[in-house]
Amino acid sequence: KGDASIPIDGLIWMVSIDEMKDRVRQKMQDGFTVLKFKIGALDFQSEYELLSQVRKEFGAALEIRVDANGAFEEKNVKGVLAKLDAINVHSIEQPVRPGQRKLMREICQETSVPIALDEELIGIHLIEDKVEVLESIRPQYIILKPSLHGGLVGTLEWISLAKEMGIGWWITSALESSIGLEVIARMA
């Protein structure tokens, strides 16, 4: 058995402040230094206050990522991103619904919070379509789920394109079985 490991992030769902702090403490005791918070389920001001308190208590030792699952709209997304920037959030996954490429490109260019495409990539299998989505949006990151991106070959195509375009990427799962998780781990 080797000493090498694959870094993973811990997932925190939005709940009460005390419960969230307990979960964050537990994750940090378990060795996590990167936590992803699901946002967009509550009103954003409440979520922002929760994230602000977590940032205040845990400081720079904790890398905060957020996943919005397309929860925000053109009228509020820039304000949301400005607030997330104020608390030094690492990145936000899919801030607006898929299919809004012009808006997504605009926020990728204008915000200092890096944008990660997630749901935007699902169902895109042809290489020319992959090139088109990445060139039209120019995200800072892409999130890859092999079971949703054509398996190993489709995922490796996304990785190759991302590298060519200077786009960061990471691999995650979409409720895979233990066999699927092993394949993802071997890819990482």
Regions flagged by a language model, labelled:
Residues 23-27, 185:
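Short, surface-exposed amphipathic charged segments that create phosphate/polyanion-binding patches used
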Residues 4-19, 39, 67-74, 116-118:
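Active-site mouth loops of central-metabolism enzymes
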Residues 1:
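Metal- or metallocofactor-binding catalytic centers and their adjacent structured scaffolds
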Residues 4-6, 33, 62, 140:
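Short amphipathic alpha-helical segments
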Residues 18-22, 49-50:
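Active-site glycine-rich loop that binds ribose-phosphate moieties when present
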Residues 42-182, 186:
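Catalytic core of soluble alpha/beta enzymes
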